[in-house]
UniProtKB/Swiss-Prot annotation:
The family this protein is said to belong to: Belongs to the GHMP kinase family. GalK subfamily.
Binding annotation for substrate: E40, H41, I42, D43, Y229
Pfam families: GalKase_gal_bdg (PF10509), GHMP_kinases_C (PF08544), GHMP_kinases_N (PF00288)
Domain of life: Bacteria
GO CC terms of this entry: cytosol
EC number: 2.7.1.6
Pathway: Carbohydrate metabolism; galactose metabolism
Native source species: Clostridium tetani (strain Massachusetts / E88)
GO molecular function: ATP binding; galactokinase activity; magnesium ion binding
Active site: residue positions: D179
Keywords from the UniProt entry: ATP-binding, Carbohydrate metabolism, Cytoplasm, Galactose metabolism, Kinase, Magnesium, Metal-binding, Nucleotide-binding, Transferase
Origin organism lineage: Bacteria, Bacillati, Bacillota, Clostridia, Eubacteriales
Name this protein carries in UniProt: Galactokinase
Membrane spanning stretches: none
Length: 392
């Protein structure tokens, strides 16, 4: 489990690197975590999402080697992994190391240059929190390889796709493209309105005025592979097949609300209908959120966050008692104008939009009430909106 630290020091990491790998020059990189403001479980349904990069994430130091060996070490986890570039395969015992291995393999398979490296990473994104520790690590490695071996000339969107492919095909976890996109393409004080179908995107300035986005960690770990994530994807595919009897589309999110309402009679299974309803309406909420933030209408934006959570709870059924408790308690506190779960669900984190002057009281009340309901306390992190992966 990653130990939470509010600030990572690159100089400390450099010293650790020298202890492990010896004296010499090195290059240093940072890759953020991400939070999706709204638009949950629709990235794999061709929908719009609205993520931003955080100002905490994963630091990495790297040095080129003269051979084909890659050494991976972390300050967070004792496990060290060494691989040969000519023989990269998934090995369960390599744990976290499979994420960098997957990215390296995908880049090699594309015919791009990769050489031997000594790498040390240090992250402060809690594992299983839903803040994209895996995408942060994947893009850290991808941008390292781009800058060190390819003069920074590789297309960033291609690196995003290769990182997603590494997680899907090499590690074997289903994920949409949003996490990698937000981590790589984030800009300070901007959210990204991303069409996951076409990868068209535009930036929206996020001016929260007297409010702050607070991340609330239920402290219940979320395991993607153990969750019902894959089951939900299959249910959405069922809905899509049924809709396709009348209207040929590639993704549910291609439907407008009016089109969906006129075609939903094709879906007889109530559970499958609920999943599809969430997807289509959530996609509309994202577009409205973009508009509301551009007008700085924070109160209405906050209401959309709550609507999103209730839909994820009642229609998509991916919240669970911990997320429902923390969001419910947040919405009951004066000064909070919106809250919702983020990530895949079944644990992990939620976000709340809270008045800055009431933040300390908010955290105290939510923490105490959550503890009464669940039996242990949550964690709180406040982050600014930061830059995508970069070389320091």
């Amino acid at each position: 489990m990653v130990k939470w630290r509010n600030n990572m020091n690159i100089n400390e990491l450099k010293k650790e690197f020298i202890k492990i790998y010896g004296e010499g020059s090195m290059r240093n990189f940072f890759s953020p975590g991400r939070v999706n403001l709204i638009g949950e479980h629709i990235d794999y349904n061709g929908g719009h999402v609205f993520p931003c990069a955080l100002n905490f994430g994963t630091l990495g130091c790297v040095r080129k080697r003269k051979d084909n060996k890659v050494n991976l070490a972390s300050t967070n986890i004792p496990l060290k992994v060494s691989i040969n570039l000519e023989d990269i395969k998934y090995e369960k015992k390599h744990g976290w190391g499979n994420y960098p291995k997957g990215v390296i393999k995908e880049i090699i398979d594309k015919g791009y240059k990769v050489g031997g490296m000594d790498i040390l990473i240090s992250g402060n994104i809690p594992n299983g929190s839903g803040l994209s520790s895996s995408a942060s690590l994947e893009l850290l490695i991808a941008i390292m390889i781009n800058n060190i071996f390819n003069d920074g000339k590789l297309d960033k969107v291609e690196l995003i796709k290769l990182s997603q492919k590494a997680e899907n095909d090499f590690v074997g976890l289903n994920c949409g493209i949003m996490d990698q996109f937000a981590v790589a393409m984030g800009k300070k004080d901007m959210a990204i309105l991303l069409d996951c179908n076409t990868l068209e995107y535009k930036y929206a300035p996020v001016d929260l005025g007297n409010y702050v986005i607070t991340i609330m960690n239920t402290n219940k770990r979320r395991e993607l592979s153990d969750s019902k994530y894959n089951e939900r994807r299959l249910e959405c595919e069922k809905a899509l097949k049924l809709i396709n009897k009348e209207k040929k589309i590639n993704y549910l999110c291609e439907l407008s609300l009016e089109e969906f309402e006129s075609l939903k009679y094709l879906i007889k299974d109530n559970r499958v209908l609920n999943r599809a309803t969430h997807v289509v309406y959530e996609n509309e909420r994202v577009k409205r959120a973009y508009y509301l933030l551009s007008k700085r209408n924070l109160k209405e934006f906050g209401k959309l966050l709550a609507e999103s959570h209730f839909s994820l709870r009642d229609l998509y059924e991916v919240t669970g008692k911990e997320l429902d408790a923390i969001v419910g308690e947040a919405l009951n506190v004066s000064g909070c104008i919106g809250a919702r779960m983020i990530g895949a669900g079944f644990g992990g984190c939620a976000i709340a939009l809270v008045e800055k002057s009431k933040l300390d009281l908010f955290k105290k009340k939510v923490s105490n009430n959550y503890n009464k309901i669940i039996g242990y306390k949550p964690g709180f992190y406040t982050s600014e909106i930061g830059e995508g992966t970069y070389e320091i």
